[in-house]
């Protein structure tokens, strides 16, 4: 059985019109490919860390890595993804495996 993955998207909007062209269609396409936006946020404050802040946060839960890949590689969306690229800058896009708890990370390797 495939495990869900979470896509963390952090970015700045660089071109409003380009990003609007992306966002008008992306929500429907994300859902059609097994994704669900679970968090949207606007930068508020840096507490700890040395990463340059990004203005936008989006977290998408994908049913599986395969669903994420199908969204990224679907030939029917070849005209969509360039709007994201051209509408943003300083983009960070990381995938995280879903965990029920931290035991897989904290277990003793000894």
PLM ranges: what are they?
Residues 1-77, 94-110:
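Short S/T/G/P-rich N-terminal loop/turn motif that feeds into the first structured element of a domain
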Residues 78-88:
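C-terminal structural segments of small proteins and small subunits
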